[in-house]
């Protein structure tokens, strides 16, 4: 497997949100939401849409914390390799890297972040970045 080395610049740290951040932290980075929707248990969880830095970004919040983020190009064109690299770079903390993992047969390109807490999938139209929740059987 190949490790994608992510070069982070200071701009990326200050301008983009990370999985696990609160709604206030993400709004401080992306600006005011363009659209807000509710889902899940009694509508307490939300999907919030932003437009920032060339991307349309849909963020899924569970109990007020970002758990999933989907990045689309604003012009609605297919995601380029360069755009995928940008999303991976902005979805990692300093010192973290992304490792490509073998996709399922005919599956999309997939990566795991070096801390083991986040994965990313590129569908061709968008990049989905998700927190990984491990549920241990009781």
What is each model feature region?
Residues 16-18:
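Boundary of Sec targeting at the N-terminus
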